[in-house]
């Protein structure tokens, strides 16, 4: 018995200023790309939510300083967004240019027990792990920051 051929993976790749206006525009591009490739329902909603969380973190903590618009950046800072759909799963990765220690972020992704509800930070990344099958952090390809990669199997939830 042979299995049906798996569709080729489709990728959306964006390099944008690390500002909230870019993240807002990218959300629309990610949604359009995913819908054009047949993603819908809970899988689409989760992709948009996770992409938004990763981009927002890149803007706020990955070198963008929380800038709303590009004019507010003290220096040019970019984020790189990749969305891959392969017919069985999606993945989204966001790389920033804000330095950082992968071990510190990994601890936020995989805390011992629930995150402290009194802490002002750290819950978003943890909550993101509940919607994904895996979330990883590593040094970005340009070594200027971090790259977070989230994956979800389609229809698994």
Regions found by a protein language model. Name each.
Residues 1-13, 59-157:
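Conserved beta-strand-loop-beta-strand hairpin that lines the nucleotide-binding pocket
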Residues 1-49:
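Bergerat-fold GHKL ATPase/HATPase_c domain
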């Amino acid at each position: 018995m042979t299995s049906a051929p798996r569709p080729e993976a489709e990728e959306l790749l964006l390099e944008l200023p690390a500002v909230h206006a870019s993240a807002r525009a990218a959300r629309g591009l990610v949604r359009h790309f995913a819908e054009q490739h047949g993603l819908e329902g809970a899988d689409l909603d989760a992709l948009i939510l996770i992409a938004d969380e990763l981009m927002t973190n890149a803007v706020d903590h990955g070198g963008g300083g929380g800038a709303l618009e590009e004019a507010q950046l003290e220096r040019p800072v970019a984020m790189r967004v990749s969305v891959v759909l392969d017919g069985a799963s999606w993945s989204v990765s966001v790389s920033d240019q804000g330095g950082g220690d992968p071990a510190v972020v990994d601890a936020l992704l995989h805390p011992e027990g629930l995150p402290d509800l009194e802490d002002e930070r750290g819950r978003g990344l943890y909550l993101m792990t509940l919607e994904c099958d895996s979330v990883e952090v590593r040094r970005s390809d340009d070594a200027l920051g971090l790259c977070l990669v989230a994956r979800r199997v389609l229809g698994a939830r």
